[in-house]
Amino acid sequence: MAWLRFSSSVENVLIPRTLKLYGLSPALALDIFGTISGLTLPVLLFPGVLCSCACVMLLPSVSEANAAGKDTKITKTINSCALFGLCFGLIFTCIFYLLSDFIGDFLFSSKLCGYFLRRLCFLCPLMHISGMLCSILHGLGKAKQVLFVNLLTCAIRILMIMLLVPHYGIDAYLWAMLVSHVFMTLAVRILTCHTAHK
């Protein structure tokens, strides 16, 4: 966990600095970074509370099925969770896309928050699928593998921030978010399938 916190800190330091290298003023760079990290992302992550509750309820049954060697039950649970995460994420993608301006104005009086909420709402399915599958992997005793995937995801995002944001600005950071979440989702999906059929 310490490595994840360190990676997150590095990312938080890099984003304003690379935005300044792109040509933004220090004040504008901090304003954009603060809007994304302090306003937009918490709104995107809020529905994940419901997924987290479902994950906590799943852990005992997954661990029990794993101990009993019930691979079929584990596979069904994995598929059900992935489908639930996809549907749940798509619902909130639509909500955030259609109501982004209203949410930004109503909650924070920030049109910039609404703009980034519309740009980032497509991450919702990926975040919910990967979150639920990571919980299943924890139940299967694969915490180290989940940590490794998380570190790789952070490394991809940091690398893209360093290389692309100075040249393409905030759009490059949004792409880094998308690419890293796609990688995370695919990695944990492959890992869960491999673990279930091992």
What are these regions (language model features)?
Residues 122-149:
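Membrane-interface junctions at transmembrane-helix termini in multi-pass inner-membrane proteins
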Residues 91-109, 167:
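Short membrane-interface helical motifs at transmembrane helix boundaries
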Residues 37, 70-87, 91-99, 117:
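Interfacial transmembrane-helix starts/ends
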Residues 45-68:
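Helix-loop junctions and terminal segments of transmembrane helices
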